[in-house]
Amino acid sequence: LNRREPPLFPNFKHLPVAYHGRASSVTISGAPCRRPWGQIVRPGADGPSFEPARMLDYEMEIGAYVGVGNPMGYPIPLAEADQRLFGLCLLNDWSARDIQGWEMAPLGPFLSKSFMTSVSPWVVTMEALAPFRMAAANRGADAPALSPHLNDPTDRLDGGLDVTVDVYLLSERMRADGLDPALRSRGYFRKNYWTVFQMMAHHASNGCNLQTGDLYGSGTVSGPSREEMGCLLEITDRGALT
């Protein structure tokens, strides 16, 4: 209703557009990733073709596990979020960029991400992370005022986390040649715009009931420099750089 022309996105007549988050394809780190198939529009093509993805990517994220949920209809105040979060893990949100580029309008990625998500086998509890708590990141002078459900003095004081995440690349050829993993990027979660507690409070702000064991991702941990970017899409500027 908000879009006048054209009334439908180009992909509407080619696939049933959808968006979801899927728990069944969350796997422990080390499980093999099979290249997904999907609809892809190649440069110069008149329409999509169904074929294997060529632009398989990773996204380095922090995963957060809910410890204590909330009843349906009752939001989680931001001031309580740190008492409800159990712990954090590493999360790789595998992404097929060429599938994603075609399917994501207007609802976001669907088959380009649902094929697999990897998480570390260990969960670091919030108690263990207590020494690494710090002030939330500076949102900048031009940042709008925080919505009331995302604004709490305690979160601003120590909602941030001084956690560094490294991405190493070890290809099949590198293994065969006996080479060590190569550091691809290093991200700093302390720079994240939103805290993990704000994410929880926002998720439940409409009364959505979170449950013990629920997992949510932080989004790609990236920074302004190329060395801090947490996915190949950003590092290569959509394939323009090597």
What spans do the regions from the language model cover?
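Active-site pocket scaffolds in enzymes
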Residues: 193-205, 211-212, 216-242
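Active-site microenvironments in enzyme catalytic cores
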Residues: 1-185, 193-197
